[in-house]
Amino acid sequence: MSPTPTSRVATLKGGKGPGRTIALRADIDALPVEEAQGLECRSLVPGVSHVCGHDAHAAMLLGTAKLLLSLKDEIQGTVKFFFQHAEEQAPGGAAEMVKAGVLKGVDACVGLHVMNDPIGLVRITTTPAVTTTCDEITVTIKGRGTHGSMPHAGVDPILVGAEMVLAMHTIVSRNLPPGRFAVVSPTIFQAGNAVNVIPDTAKIGVNFRTKSEEDRDFLFERIEAVARSVAAVHGAEVDIHGVRGCAATIQDPAMIERALRVAKEVMPADKVATGTGMTGSEDFSAFAQKVPSVYLILGGGTAEEGYPYANHHPAFRPDEGCFMAGVRIEAAMALDFLMRP
């Protein structure tokens, strides 16, 4: 089944008849990053590579499908395998798959991602929010250009933008209490192309993340308010464009407990850990908003184990020794959900 042009869904129906349905999801898209030279598994496509581990996710889900297929006659219920496109591109392929109806009849969903944890370690986040929202605002500042020697004759959009950036950096620390995660990161500042010209315009791009919809709405409102008020003080104007990306991934408490129990049953004791989530974002949230879900972190190797590069680095790669651990936990979660309600 192809719910979208670049995603796939495979279905395995158990030999013991109908029952519950669980979906296992792997994101499969690459990144616009030139992979580092010298890697034995280097991308053959110029400027594009799997430096976030999504190729590993696809391989593990295929392995899980093969394993569960061999156990088909012992399974009651259905397993769906989601090979999802466009996780890296807001608002994300998961939402498109949900819109296409892939969750019809699905009772639960499991996601997994390789990170820089010890090889084969399964980390379960015990708090509901395992990932954050991911949103952005672009502010175009309209000043009035002038000669670099006569700033009084214009409205300097660079100065306006600089004050905006400084003010935006105070939004979290002066409005949200410690322990309530949020981050506002101005990441783009573009202006001018000549050293003796104060330009007409400048552009600021802001990325911001949090773990609650309440704080998400607050950040949208406050970033815009800061931009408009700072511009007004200097006699500038602004155009503001916001993009609402993926929501925070909120796990189901019962699925968290199930994952903890299953991991302890099928993994070595030193290969199970707990955590409090991460500050990055994941469009798996689109599935988690609709059905009870859990999102697992799988260790692909640490610097001490010879894997010093984090996800999105041109030389990132997980140790293939983690693949069997990923297959084991995915298959075990599926079997446990179907056979031990």
Task: Please state what every model-predicted region is.
Residues L31-S49, D55-A56, L61-L62, L68, ...:
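Histidine/acidic-residue-rich, glycine-tolerant segments that coordinate divalent metal ions
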Residues L12, I141-G143, F208:
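Hydrophobic beta-strand positions in extracellular immunoglobulin-like domains
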Residues M1-P18:
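A non-catalytic alpha/beta surface segment that caps or lines the substrate-entry region
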Residues L159-P341:
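Metal-dependent amide/peptide-bond hydrolase catalytic core
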Residues A23-R25, I137-V139, Y295-G300:
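Non-cysteine beta-strand/loop elements that form the S-adenosyl-L-methionine
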Residues M1-T4, H50-A56, G277:
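Active-site nucleophile and cofactor-binding loops and adjacent substrate-binding regions
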Residues R20-A23, T78:
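Residues that mark the start of a beta-strand
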Residues A10, L24, H54, F81, ...:
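Divalent metal-coordination and catalytic microenvironments
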